[in-house]
Amino acid sequence: NAITRRRMEVLRRLATGEPCTIIATVDAMYDKIPALSYMKKYVINIHVAQSLDLDELKGKLVDLGYEKTDSVEEPGQFAIRGGIVDIFPLTEECPYRIDMWDDEVDTIKTFDAESQRSIENVDELVIYPAGEMVLSKERIDRGIHRLEAELKPYAKKLKDSFQTEAYARIKGEIATLKEQLTEFSAIYGVDSYVDYFYSDTVSLVDCLPEDAYIFIDETKKVT
């Protein structure tokens, strides 16, 4: 998703203090997201000569929202074949290939996704989450519990007042969300529930540095 990729690149720059220009609607600037500290917490750093457990790496990448595939073609995908790991970080322009020697990282190089030809060797690879929300099983369970607890009185009220269609719709939406989250499948719109899964949320405005310049176009529409 191109929009997700651009948003994650902006968040990466804000988290690392890199300069960036953001063009967005007022609503988008005030949308809730997890605090940037969560993003920093889940970053994966891999460097040459580092010991690396591939099973552990696979689990971490899945938790970060990356999709395991047979071959890497798009951002947000990774593949493991023997002692070779290909990954296309969401915030990078090209994929990376990690060659292992036993349990140690031998080389890290960028490569072209179409031709599979190597571009250049690098010493380190930094992998950021593939989405704004990193949802472990524990966080999913807590979030679903909070959501169900909040909606339970409302759902009961609908049921008691014989608003059966509205009641069935709410129950269905919760069941679908729960099923998708449990299966760790791609979920669109889950960011609408961010407050249920994270106790510490912010907006993009909160993440801007103190010396940031803010320009508002068409101020009449803002008010």
Model-predicted regions and their roles:
Residues 1-223:
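ASCE RecA-like P-loop NTPase motor cores
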